[in-house]
């Protein structure tokens, strides 16, 4: 009985996958709460442990240069990418029941969207931070079935040649059904309906067996009203802020 030892420090850290859907996640919560207090439970996303991800808060809220520009008046769009140049390797049994949407979008990419879009907490503590993250999720514009068809793309990698080596198709991987429709790629266009981000599209994408391995956030700023440095065809190189999370951390 962990709750019967007030002098002991007992914590439980829970990583993904935390259930298969909303109902199973709620059932797991009830199981844990029978033996632990809420303050002893840590449901973590290991992406938040990456140094560059943690630095997003300082970049935004301790920076007098970027924060005044961090809104719909100056930002045209936001792109968040997390792709890998390898397949599922030996994780077939897990991955075919999960897919890219559950494996990456609803946790890792959702956290990156929240860190990019959230309002500054009044103080830097876990509860206030979480409250601002929740506000972002509550502001996601719901999608109708028709909008899902237009704004969401799901894909699955096929056989290919990569650096002179043959790469198997997803359906040829170990423990994968030959008719599997599990996605290994997801891209979607999101909108956050609040004062700061109204009308600014957030593009997120993730996938296996892509041409490169990279996780990054790209902030695309709006062009200047008068293009002094336009090229002969009238175009200009857009201003971007790139936050590279991996493989080479940097801004």
Q: Language-model segments: what does each one mean?
A:
Residues 1-251:
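Secretory/organelle targeting and membrane-embedding segments
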